[in-house]
Amino acid sequence: RKEYVLHHDNETYYGHVSRNGIYISWDHFARGYHDYTDGVNVGLHEMAHAISYDVFLGYQDRHDRGFKRRLQEFRVEGGPVFRAMKEGDPHLLDSYAATNFDEFWAVCVETFFETPESLRDEEPGLYATICELLNQDPTRQDKIIDKRMAGIRY
């Protein structure tokens, strides 16, 4: 239920993704939904890892090429922000985002859903790229951007 230690590296985890599944400390998962605005949500964080893991390491033939392209666009748009954080620049994103680019992506997803207005205001290009990538804008009343892409019929 609480954080756990993996035998291969003796590190403490709240969640992780592997080819065998998504593993999450239930206590930390539940905490993520007690405060929707603190920017911390292990469930969202690990789902972001699962998305990138599956797109880049999973079965390539089952993925929408457009989605992979949009994920690459995120890498281009997010690169300068990530590099600035690595150099120690203060940022809205949790400092854990500077660990590596995979963590940067996962922290961006947490922030996108937990404090979308702040991310939109501080990093409008990054925010717009994530909106397009995930086909939603949490700041809008009608959150889905392209209903056809989401499979919604009129």
Q: Language-model features: where?
A:
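Short alpha-helix carrying the canonical HExxH Zn2+-binding catalytic motif
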Residues: 35-52
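Metalloprotease/metallohydrolase-associated module, dominated by Zn2+-dependent proteases
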Residues: 2-37, 54-154
